[in-house]
From Swiss-Prot:
Presence of the UniProt keyword Lipoprotein in the record: no
Membrane-topology annotation of the record: Multi-pass membrane protein
Family: Belongs to the TMEM211 family.
Keywords: Membrane, Transmembrane, Transmembrane helix
Protein's UniProt name: LHFPL tetraspan subfamily member 7 protein
Length: 200
């Protein structure tokens, strides 16, 4: 049961993170929107007639802060995807092959992915000071959008980063010391594992 929940959470988090990365709605005006990898423009009052451009390489991204942010966010997403695939294989593997089902494997990978995503999200608004964005957002600067307002894509990316950082915290086994022995409590099972104390 626990493994299926973690697989569902890992896969859904990976999918929504990918969706927010390709979204052009991180910051927007009435006629323009942009994200980490895509920007779109349309005539005033006709948002159904959009013309969108995707940055095909890092050289096409207009600002260095954007490039760093894109690398961090894509790296974090790749780690999330790797972790989700690993969780899926862990969940469908026979119990004899993976005997320790009491805790979720590799919470550290997910923690590194969450850290990379958070750093990428914090670096991205520095790019609001670039000439490319100043032309659209008028009077924008670092961490200030000018006439551009936050879009749902950036908010979704923030929510994904928060969830990605909470999941590893939940999955770490809880430990307590009782009479010289370490007892590992796992919320996944009702077993208690006694670990003898090592002499220092």
């Amino acid at each position: 049961m626990l493994s299926s929940v973690w697989v569902a959470l890992g896969l859904s988090l990976t999918c929504t993170s990918a969706f927010s990365l390709i979204s052009p709605a991180w910051f927007q005006t009435p006629t323009f929107s942009f994200g980490i990898l895509t920007y779109c423009s349309w005539p005033q009052g006709n948002s159904w007639n959009q013309s969108c451009v995707t940055f095909s390489s890092l050289e096409d991204i207009p600002d260095f802060a954007w490039k760093v942010s894109a690398v961090m966010l894509l790296g974090g997403w790749l780690l999330l995807a790797f972790n989700a695939i690993f969780l899926l294989s862990w969940a469908v593997a026979p119990k004899g092959l993976c005997p320790r089902r009491s805790s979720v494997p590799m919470p550290g990978v997910q923690a590194v992915a969450a850290t990379a995503m958070i750093v990428g999200l914090l670096i991205f608004p520095i790019g609001l000071a670039s000439p490319f964005i100043k032309e659209v957002c008028e009077a924008s600067s670092m961490y200030y959008g000018g006439k551009c307002r936050l879009g749902w894509g950036y908010m979704t990316a923030i929510l994904n980063a928060v969830l990605a950082s909470l999941l590893p915290i939940i999955s770490w086994p809880h430990t307590t010391k009782v009479q010289g022995r370490t007892i590992i409590f796992s919320s996944a099972t009702e077993r208690i594992i006694f670990v003898p104390e090592m002499n220092k």
